[in-house]
């Protein structure tokens, strides 16, 4: 997909916030396969709470940007989120996932990577922040796929004061994959379901059609098996900390229904649909793909202000 800037004016609103620069400190987490690198964003405040920001799927870096195989998408969503929270007296830690950008040295061979590796990394950061006397409390925020990672890292973890699901899926990954391919011919849909059924049962599939090799290549199947074990509805129900579920109503990647499924699974959770916010946390008044794509490639467009206000109220309640 080539991202166009046509129509970007539809996504710029005066309600967005201009923030001053925050102080940043580089930090790293040692793992058996190498260092994972991140940045702490510090507000001008004494002993602030800190929020661990966990990015979504794919080659997404700590700032919320993608740069892989000749495809670049810079929107600075997580960096802008960190800056906005710093203005409100809240510290953040965002990091490059193992194998991505500055954490590329911590990569595992694809066939050795498991979903639990990302969970363990998040738990490592939580431990690190919990031991840092500069911060009053540790909160976890997971965006998109990072929501499930953050949930799992927070279950039975007394070091986590509260959890925030931001545009997190409410269904298992295999359901989402099958939905995304629902427009394909019936034969393809049948093959995908058959492969997924095997992977859900913990069985790798050897005969993958060439057209599905990118999605189900043999080296990624162990990771998919590990990912498919988790249903976000079941995981979020195990959380004992305060939980905030946030979803934008102009998100074309994750639906409001996903957020509602999470809320149904944990009725006591706080829940808010944010008006005119899309998947990269920007103000956008349209679900038209050309307009949406403009925000995905605009690093100067601020994040939605109500998002910052809602997170601040939750963290400082």
Task: Name each model-derived stretch.
Residues 16-46, 50:
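N-terminal cap/lid segment of alpha/beta-hydrolase-fold proteins
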Residues 1-14:
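Single conserved hydrophobic/aromatic residue that forms the stacking wall/gate
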Residues 277-281, 286-317:
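Catalytic active-site module of serine/aspartate enzymes centered on a nucleophile-bearing elbow/loop
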